[in-house]
Amino acid sequence: MEISKVRIQDIPEEERPRERLIRNGPESLSNSELLGVILRTGSNKENVVSLSSRIFSEYSIKQLSLANVSRLMKVHGVGKAKAAQIAAVFELARRLETFVEEPKRKVCSPKDVYTLMYPKMREQKKEKFITLCLDTKNQILKEEVVSIGSLNASIVHPREVFKSALMESSASVIMIHNHPSGDPSPSREDIMVTEKMVEGGKLLGIDVLDHIIIGEGRYVSLKDEGFVR
């Protein structure tokens, strides 16, 4: 039987492009195999492996990247949906070439954190608990909302607080939450949560640099108050 007539599901699983990509990484696939993963299905007359190989026999990768949807649809077996998929992939590749990553924001003091977070938190009607995940230069890797509602030491768990920090390989975190009343004075619960997270961070090798409470036009740093050691 011609390979073009073989259904993709009849090809041994370990030989299918998608499964090989998952197992060995995308660099292990040829151009036509990568295209097959993108297209997913072939036509009524040929499977996706054969279709992708034929496309690359008619076009170089450069020509394919420059072809618009109308031109791609002239390839036998390529309809509007497949043409759009191909065009979208190459457009993403072009955008990657011109992508410039924004410089990471650096925080060096409680005032820096307050200046950054106050505009986002001043009109919140409920308490919002946020962590800033930082690298070794105190540059922000990620800002994560951990919980919304009254801060409670029995509810806020280190697992949620440090989840993003672990995923981002953060060196440290800063915790922030607001007091909708406008008074940033720490409650007993605030202090308990702080102490609990500081201990949790020590176990995980992630420093808790501070816990900052934001009120109306002012803030309190629990590090400055002596509760973060």
Curated annotation (Swiss-Prot):
Q: Which species is this UniProt entry from?
A: Methanosarcina barkeri (strain Fusaro / DSM 804)
Protein keywords: Hydrolase, Metal-binding, Metalloprotease, Protease, Zinc
Swiss-Prot/TrEMBL GO biological process terms: proteolysis
Q: At which positions is Zn(2+) bound?
A: 177, 179, 190
- By its UniProt entry, which Pfam families does this protein fall under? RadC, UPF0758_N
Question: Where does this protein have coiled-coil stretches?
Answer: none
Q: List the disulfide bonds.
A: none
Tell me where in this chain the MPN domain is found.
106-228
Protein name per the record? UPF0758 protein Mbar_A2303
